[in-house]
UniProtKB/Swiss-Prot annotation:
It is an enzyme of class 2 (transferase). It catalyses: uridine(54) in tRNA + (6R)-5,10-methylene-5,6,7,8-tetrahydrofolate + NADH + H(+) = 5-methyluridine(54) in tRNA + (6S)-5,6,7,8-tetrahydrofolate + NAD(+); uridine(54) in tRNA + (6R)-5,10-methylene-5,6,7,8-tetrahydrofolate + NADPH + H(+) = 5-methyluridine(54) in tRNA + (6S)-5,6,7,8-tetrahydrofolate + NADP(+). Gene3D superfamilies: FAD/NAD(P)-binding domain (3.50.50.60). Its cofactor is FAD. Belongs to the MnmG family. TrmFO subfamily. This is Methylenetetrahydrofolate--tRNA-(uracil-5-)-methyltransferase TrmFO. FAD binds at G9, A10, G11, L12, A13, G14. It comes from Bacillus licheniformis (strain ATCC 14580 / DSM 13 / JCM 2505 / CCUG 7422 / NBRC 12200 / NCIMB 9375 / NCTC 10341 / NRRL NRS-1264 / Gibson 46). GO terms for biological process: tRNA methylation; tRNA wobble uridine modification. Keywords: Cytoplasm, FAD, Flavoprotein, Methyltransferase, NAD, NADP, Transferase, tRNA processing. It is found in: Cytoplasm. Its main location: cytoplasm. Catalyzes the folate-dependent formation of 5-methyl-uridine at position 54 (M-5-U54) in all tRNAs. The lineage of its organism: Bacteria, Bacillati, Bacillota, Bacilli, Bacillales.
Amino acid sequence: MNQTVNVIGAGLAGSEAAWQLAKRGINVRLYEMRPVKQTPAHHTDKFAELVCSNSLRANSLTNAVGVLKEEMRVLDSAIIAAADECSVPAGGALAVDRHEFAANVTEKVKNHPNVTVLHEEVTEIPEGPTIIATGPLTSEALSAKLRELTGEDYLYFYDAAAPIVEKDSLDMDKVYLKSRYDKGEAAYLNCPMTEEEFDRFYDALVSAETVPLKEFEKEIFFEGCMPIEVMAKRGKKTMLFGPMKPVGLEDPKTGKRPYAVVQLRQDDAAGTLYNIVGFQTHLKWGDQKEVLRLIPGLEQAEIVRYGVMHRNTFINSPSLLKATYQFKKRDDLFFAGQMTGVEGYVESAASGLVAGINAARLIQGKEPVTFSNETAIGSMAHYITETNKKNFQPMNANFGLFKELGVKIKNKQERNEQYASRALETIRNISKTL
């Protein structure tokens, strides 16, 4: 019981992991290289510094990330407690004073008697129980060691993710199921376009606003994966020879080949989520919504994850991790945070919470806990370890990842309330066993 756990990185995930360990009586060696070595995005030496927005998104239980927060409150999350204490008015969202928030987390974790903080860069993966939570801007030296550990093909340095939509929100009268040239099983939903519809879509796409690039993203940005808006600007017909190619996708209703086709590919095992093939994008989210709703069948599409392209060091978790956030080849090594493929502040902290709980259980000689995918916490762990390893991209919390209810509820709010009610009952039962 006198073993020490190394936690590398004092961001949202690392700070939460350290707290969960320390409160269970486990000694923690918490490494944070700032301020000795800064990242291109951070400005302080504080733990859990929010480098982008100051919003932790929705607080309502009719939203998956709101359910995730409530689950974390049940499990005594340091991050959510700090956010609640440092909140600022933000309507239905939980937003914080970022300076007070970081100071709160830093003080709480740093002052715990079981935590020793070391401000130094870690350049080797330590032996003994360890949680790696170094985030999307992991240092070059540690990235090199992670590449050695995971293999060249399992470590990525940027996101290039297409939008994901809920199948239930699509107009199925306008789309059809088919694979190109009818090869294999019919695996894609196809949205056919006339020339007029394509022209309208094209004009909206090339005039939409993009997110400005940060300086440290520019060098790696377009390696091997071109945003759909950049492709469009190369010529009006470029997309017709790329992701919107209609060849081999005749519409079964007409027997004719459409002028253009947008394909959607199943993204989860339950078949509730679909990604838009080849539509990785850097458009602003409001513009994405407007442009995508010009696609036939997607007029009322619910977007559960917007397309993103940004610097992000992450591993191929389906190949490498268990749902307990343990490395498959080494039980005393855990990963947490955005590095695992969870997307978002709250999701990152939640993964740290699970890694911290399970590292403590390992030292205590107990079985690591696998959270049910009836919960938001468990649905994230399930997604990053069970999804298709060939097309793995980071994901944020959404009800499409939850285990299905088993009953069809048409009203979206009622359906989400049922997801929330079941999740919180499950998490309270789990919390009694921890």
